[in-house]
Curated annotation (Swiss-Prot):
Organism: Human herpesvirus 1 (strain 17) (HHV-1)
Name of this chain's protein: DNA polymerase catalytic subunit
Biased composition (Basic and acidic residues): 650-661, 676-691
The protein's role, per its UniProt record: Replicates viral genomic DNA. The replication complex is composed of six viral proteins: the DNA polymerase, processivity factor, primase, primase-associated factor, helicase, and ssDNA-binding protein. Additionally, the polymerase contains an intrinsic ribonuclease H (RNase H) activity that specifically degrades RNA/DNA heteroduplexes or duplex DNA substrates in the 5' to 3' direction. Therefore, it can catalyze the excision of the RNA primers that initiate the synthesis of Okazaki fragments at a replication fork during viral DNA replication.
Signal peptide coordinates: none
Major localisation: host cell
GO biological process, any: bidirectional double-stranded viral DNA replication
GO molecular function: 5'-3' exonuclease activity; DNA binding; DNA polymerase activity; DNA-directed DNA polymerase activity; nucleotide binding; RNA-DNA hybrid ribonuclease activity
InterPro entries: DNA-dir_DNA_pol_B, DNA-dir_DNA_pol_B_CS, DNA-dir_DNA_pol_B_exonuc, DNA-dir_DNA_pol_B_multi_dom, DNA/RNA_pol_sf, DNA_pol_B_thumb, DNA_pol_palm_dom_sf, DNA_pol_type-B
Amino acid sequence: MFSGGGGPLSPGGKSAARAASGFFAPAGPRGASRGPPPCLRQNFYNPYLAPVGTQQKPTGPTQRHTYYSECDEFRFIAPRVLDEDAPPEKRAGVHDGHLKRAPKVYCGGDERDVLRVGSGGFWPRRSRLWGGVDHAPAGFNPTVTVFHVYDILENVEHAYGMRAAQFHARFMDAITPTGTVITLLGLTPEGHRVAVHVYGTRQYFYMNKEEVDRHLQCRAPRDLCERMAAALRESPGASFRGISADHFEAEVVERTDVYYYETRPALFYRVYVRSGRVLSYLCDNFCPAIKKYEGGVDATTRFILDNPGFVTFGWYRLKPGRNNTLAQPAAPMAFGTSSDVEFNCTADNLAIEGGMSDLPAYKLMCFDIECKAGGEDELAFPVAGHPEDLVIQISCLLYDLSTTALEHVLLFSLGSCDLPESHLNELAARGLPTPVVLEFDSEFEMLLAFMTLVKQYGPEFVTGYNIINFDWPFLLAKLTDIYKVPLDGYGRMNGRGVFRVWDIGQSHFQKRSKIKVNGMVNIDMYGIITDKIKLSSYKLNAVAEAVLKDKKKDLSYRDIPAYYAAGPAQRGVIGEYCIQDSLLVGQLFFKFLPHLELSAVARLAGINITRTIYDGQQIRVFTCLLRLADQKGFILPDTQGRFRGAGGEAPKRPAAAREDEERPEEEGEDEDEREEGGGEREPEGARETAGRHVGYQGARVLDPTSGFHVNPVVVFDFASLYPSIIQAHNLCFSTLSLRADAVAHLEAGKDYLEIEVGGRRLFFVKAHVRESLLSILLRDWLAMRKQIRSRIPQSSPEEAVLLDKQQAAIKVVCNSVYGFTGVQHGLLPCLHVAATVTTIGREMLLATREYVHARWAAFEQLLADFPEAADMRAPGPYSMRIIYGDTDSIFVLCRGLTAAGLTAVGDKMASHISRALFLPPIKLECEKTFTKLLLIAKKKYIGVIYGGKMLIKGVDLVRKNNCAFINRTSRALVDLLFYDDTVSGAAAALAERPAEEWLARPLPEGLQAFGAVLVDAHRRITDPERDIQDFVLTAELSRHPRAYTNKRLAHLTVYYKLMARRAQVPSIKDRIPYVIVAQTREVEETVARLAALRELDAAAPGDEPAPPAALPSPAKRPRETPSPADPPGGASKPRKLLVSELAEDPAYAIAHGVALNTDYYFSHLLGAACVTFKALFGNNAKITESLLKRFIPEVWHPPDDVAARLRTAGFGAVGAGATAEETRRMLHRAFDTLA
């Protein structure tokens, strides 16, 4: 680091030289440099500003870098509210012009140029070079032997473009005429940033020699090179016109196609290519009739796999290469990156330093941006493409990743900003650095300063909350679209690098983005949190409360424009809000340590961290399989036509981005979109989601015996079921055959497995005939995981965390293998393998059921196998019966046995079954024993485990969509069922009889406490003094309202109401709160107006909703024409509104005293209870609701407005009313007496 200081510490930014507000003020002591005189403030363009149309591109930087190192004019956009001396009518909108001067920054009473490098800078700097000038101290010449690599880049260099005198001949040979260069980016133990350029890596692909010679009449490898060069020169465009045969090298090798056992070794041309672009073109276009192999493997993967031991994340050592050649240090003026030291070498100059496992002092940047719309509607959501919508503040926290220490807190502010003293004192009390407030006159200057910090400080890791989908896209769109700033030099590369965000499709209707920045690993904590934990809301405040037990001082979006316009002190409140967001995200980062698990996966899979984050599970398994296949003499084909489904054509190049992820449950739509019957449905059969097409039958479950079980239920789990099936039965591409004649020379059962899958006979040879590649991978991974886990107890706390992340990474990759084979459009699909795994899994469930029922049908049989069972006997008849089987779990209901005894002997029972039925390494384990179990349906149950802990699977007692009142009541009912023995006994008796019987008789006496909860709930719902906050429901806005097929959704109603009231409308992925109100005349009128607004919004082009000003008033609505059935005079009876039309914003309902719809809420409560407790009544929801209603007092409950009018008139309620169940009991006793 060449400038460790963060500049003068600014106490909240109170400075003599102030941004923006001072810029627009009359000339002060600083003279003309402070801005135009007051009389010129109205047009703002003189003396410095010119019309936008005359804007010229800033003077280009020097040829060796493309980042801004100098700038003397720029587009100036700033909000007029910063002109604090102007009258109110002049402070709306923005100034937009062109300014001729260097960009400025103000801090702590000082002013300086943003791009100037010198001592006492306002932010820390680690870059050695800036603008082609070496700023290293005299004598700086660090010795580099060992360095840690965290990112790997690749690019193509041309010999004619290089200065031969600067390069060793071996490097020139590697790029003559062109060649791929791999760049390793990392850090030394001393903290020096290193870039090592590795020459000589070549990509290659394979083609069958016999096919090539037959199609192209080749007699030697050189002939093939000539044919390929000719094909490239004849391709459209001028890209390949200079290609010659010297660009290629071909050799003949013996390899075997990985598909099918009967495939035998053959001769292949291995064609080396010097450019990935050429490779892609050849594989896609050169002789399509000839199959290509491994053409999609990038240069970085080749570098890692072709050099045994090399890793994408770990320690390397420089060493002498062949013929004692050494790595060549690069001269600073020839650096291509912003590193401290650069070397040129070949792969033989590198070795892995296996003895080091800790991380060097990498830097982490955590940032957050605040934006504000600048048009007529300041409450509109900002759009990056609108020049008037501005970034107003950026908080930036800089951590040392190895020590977790927060080293710098920076706040970039458009306009002057004074942080509150209370915030500064709070940070000081926590031992955190005092924030450095950097103030700017214009948005461009602030954004340029931020990007200059990114370049000069160069954090290796960056995090934030939803930065991939919002913060980075917004910033980059501003810089490129509005200010025309080239970004290719702002990563670690000084030019020709990558710094971009792009969309990678939709997941659960959410637009997903991907960011790639050379030398900067972006880890979005929003994605990490949504993957790791399940919450009802993923807003940062909700996550902080749930995970950190902390909460932030929230600032309403509606308040930001007023705070921003109010002056430096109120802008400081926004700054505090911005900083605390980054602080919370930093805490989340160091709680989950996502970089450790991601780097462990990257290291295991042989891919860099960025691919680990964005490219899904497929690429991880593919790369590992590629490595092993090469060792065993196999090659992997590129073609995807081998296992096409009935209806689809596989793409030539399947995207590897998350295509193997299972579709998540439609959160927010499972109830919300079905409410009015217009929700979208997924078709039956094979489904295709987010690039994943599954064309085979999934794992079978044994249908559950629904009901409430108060006898012990033992749950046996298969340990790593699918990986163990693959290992036990030697399943693989290479062991599969579809032809009986291919295995005719082998002995059935002994040498191969024969199995029928989907009506077709498949054959898999045993391991002694040919060992499965997938099995080898799994065996090695699991052995590695076992060894790592064994080291954890003896490790230091820091090392234990790292080891735990490593073993978790191995588990993730192991569990990806089955899915890897089952994705039809994946990188290497084999649906036969995937379908065989699930078929064997189904057979194992059935075999286990038959074995348990036959082997332990009588207690004496159980006693013979387990003598200790004599002490397990409980009162009542004995039986052992499987009541549910779910993919890898088996539920065994054990009557006449104690839960304690079953818990003690469970592992022995599981081992007994494993030995009797399954091949190793398949094994059953006793996971738990339920003392009580409410088995509702497949994958839905609630139970109490021996010891008292409750386990809930597939049943959301606390649903995101339900209100707090319903969630609390549902939980209270469940607790009663499981922890009140009287209620449990009554419920068990209830479940043993057919549900229809209870329609004609009273419910068991023991359910009275259960009914009391429902009675109390009914009372609270109908209480006029109830707290409305308890009845707030929420639903996620999963996409823009116009994109919904079903428009009759409650949360969409509230969205349009907010828009009509010019309130802040929610963003996509926000959860919209609402309450259901009673139908009144005012509500009916509002619904009519909303219908018009929906029509306007549906017709509006673009991404933004129609302006609220377009909403017609009720008086302008067309008069409805009376129908013949209407009463005379045309006055028709008001229709009953849909529930979704009765949705209202809770804040509005509270402020205006809008009455709630009590009937809806109680029906909703009964519906929620029925979903959980219908298992007591044979899963008959209609009977369940009918019986639960017996507990409700039979009284008339008028609407709230009617009840209020009755009370005002002096009427009062008479009697509490009896419940239907009480009435039924009285009548039952009366008839018994009369009888």
